[in-house]
Amino acid sequence: MSDKPLTDVTFSSFDLHPALIAGLESAGFTRCTPIQALTLPVALPGGDVAGQAQTGTGKTLAFLVAVMNRLLIRPALADRKPEDPRALILAPTRELAIQIHKDAVKFGADLGLRFALVYGGVDYDKQRELLQQGVDVIIATPGRLIDYVKQHKVVSLHACEICVLDEADRMFDLGFIKDIRFLLRRMPERGTRQTLLFSATLSHRVLELAYEHMNEPEKLVVETESITAARVRQRIYFPSDEEKQTLLLGLLSRSEGARTMVFVNTKAFVERVARTLERHGYRVGVLSGDVPQKKRESLLNRFQKGQLEILVATDVAARGLHIDGVKYVYNYDLPFDAEDYVHRIGRTARLGEEGDAISFACERYAMSLPDIEAYIEQKIPVEPVTSELLTPLPRAPRVPVEGEEADDDAGDSVGTIFREAREQRAAEEQRRGGGRGGPGGSRSGSGGGRRDGAGADGKPRPRRKPRVEGQAPAAAASTEHPVVAAVAAQAPSAGVADAERAPRKRRRRRNGRPVEGAEPALASTPVPAPAAPRKPTQVVAKPVRAAAKPSGSPSLLSRIGRRLRSLVSGN
C-alpha cells in the first residue's frame, strides 16, 4: 500500500484472452496494482505463486485473471467429465467467498464460464443441485465443500487443474488447515495442478504448507513502507467503560452522513451497541455469527447501497469485504490480535482513498495497545476525551434513501433481527431434537429438564402429602403409571421377604485363624422381630514360648573358648 496504488503496467500488455481483456475494460480495470503486476507474469504461464500483500491491494483480481485466462486458453484434462470443476478458489469466511464470487461475475459473466458459490448457512440441497449440474469454477469455504466432496456423487476434484488459497494465514487461525490438506489430496498431483496462495503474512506455517503442496512456488512480496495504509488517519481515545457509548455518539454526530463501520469483539456487544445507535436515530446494520446468513447478505447489500449509515460487526467482516466509500472505522473494542487491527482499519482508505481509524482503549482492552503499536511500527496519536465530545450534536432530519421503501428488510429493527435469529436457532434445535426445552435435551427422561413444577404433559404436579412421623414411606406408584402400580402391588414387602429368608452363616477370622463359636451374621436389611443378643466370644491367650536354642555347630566364641581352655590345660 503506497500513495500510488496503481502501476504503469496495463492488463492489455499481457497475453490474455481477448474476451477477458474486454471484460476487464468494461468493468473499469485497465492498470495493475503492485501485487497484480508481480503475480500475472508468473501465474499466466502456469507457475505456482506464494504472494504476500496486505488487504485492499487487489489480490482477488490477480488470481481471478490468472484462473479465467487458463480456463479460456487451455483445454481441460483428458479424464474430466462435463460436470467436474476445473478450478477451485477457497476462502476462510463466507463474506470473503461471496465477495470473490461477486467480483468474478462482475467481469467474467460474458466469458461462458460457470461459477458456483458454496458456503454454509444456506440451502444445502440447492447448492448440491447446482454442483451436480456441472460448473467450471467453485468458490467455496472449506467446511461445506468437504461435505459435498465426501458424497462422491455430488462433486469430484480429480480434474481440478488450478487451485487458489486466499487469506491462507486466516485459514490457520480458524483451524481449516486439516480441511485444506484433505481437499488438496483429492486434486491432481502438484506437478499437474497449478496452485496460487495469497496471504497477508507469509509465516513459517504458511510457507510450510506452500512447499508441501505446491510445485516450486515463487515467493512474491509487495514491499510497503508501513504495514497500515498510508492514507489512514489513526487516533485513539482512552475512555472509561461507561463513556464509550457516549463518546461514540458524540464522534458520530460530528461525521454525519459518512459511511461508517464499528467493530466490537463479541457478538453480545454487537446487539448492545447497535440498539444504542438505533435508539438515537441511526440506520444500523449488524454483522455477526448470530445473524442468519441470508439476513447478513441482505444487510451488507443495503450498507453497500447507502441505505444503512453504520455497520456494527465482529471480525467476521474484517477481511476480504470491499465496500466502497467507507470513511470511518471505529474500533469500539481494541482487538486482541494486532493483525486484526490492521485488517479492521483496512476497510477504509482502499486503493488510494483516504479514511479515519478511531480506536477506544478502555480498561478491558487497553492491554492490547502495546502489541498493536509494535506490530504496525508506529505510535497511534492520542486524543483527549473532553466534555464536548461526550455531548452529541443535534442531528438533521433523516432523508429517505432511494430504493429504501422497496426493500423488504427496510423496516427490520436490530431487536427484530436478533429476535428472529434466536427463534430460528431455537426452531433448528427443536427440529434436530436438541435444546434444553425440547425432546432429547434433558438427561433425566422426558420433560426437557422443566423447572416450573409441570409434568411431562404440561399440567402442574400435585403437591406431595406431608409424611407422618414414624410411618414408613409409601410405594412410589401413582395413578399416572398403572404398570408401575401393578408391579408394586404384586411385590412382597421388604420386611416379609427378609423374615422368610434364612440367615447366612458367616465364618469370621481373626489373625488369619477361624474363630470357633461365632454366631451367623444378621441379614443386612431390618427384620420385623428383633435379633437375639450375641454372646461375646472369649479368645484364650496362648503363652509365649521361649526362644529355642540354636542347634548345629557351635558358635565362633564357643570354639575360641574351648581352644583357650585346651591350651591352658596342656600347660
Swiss-Prot record:
- Quick one: signal sequence residues? none
Please list the GO terms describing molecular function.
Answer: ATP binding; ATP hydrolysis activity; RNA binding; RNA helicase activity
Q: Which organism is it from?
A: Xanthomonas axonopodis pv. citri (strain 306)
The record's section on PROSITE patterns has: DEAD_ATP_HELICASE, HELICASE_ATP_BIND_1, HELICASE_CTER, Q_MOTIF
> Which branch of life, at top level?
Bacteria
Where is it localised? Cytoplasm
List the biased-composition ranges (Basic and acidic residues): 419-432, 449-460
What is the designated name of this protein?
A: ATP-dependent RNA helicase RhlB
Q: Does the keyword Transmembrane apply?
A: no
Q: How does it assemble?
A: Component of the RNA degradosome, which is a multiprotein complex involved in RNA processing and mRNA degradation.
**All residue ranges annotated as the Helicase ATP-binding domain in the record:** 40-220
Database matches in InterPro entries: DEAD/DEAH_box_helicase_dom (IPR011545), DEAD_box_RNA_helicase (IPR050079), Helicase_ATP-bd (IPR014001), Helicase_C-like (IPR001650), P-loop_NTPase (IPR027417), RhlB (IPR022077), RNA-helicase_DEAD-box_CS (IPR000629), RNA_helicase_ATP-dep_RhlB (IPR023554)
Its keywords, alphabetically, are: ATP-binding, Cytoplasm, Helicase, Hydrolase, Nucleotide-binding, RNA-binding
Query: What segment(s) does the record annotate as region Disordered?
Result: 391-558
Which regions are flagged for Gly residues bias?
Answer: 435-448
Q: Which Pfam families match?
A: DEAD, Helicase_C, RhlB
Q: Please tell me whether the keyword ATP-binding is annotated for this protein.
A: yes
Name of the gene encoding the protein in the UniProt record: rhlB
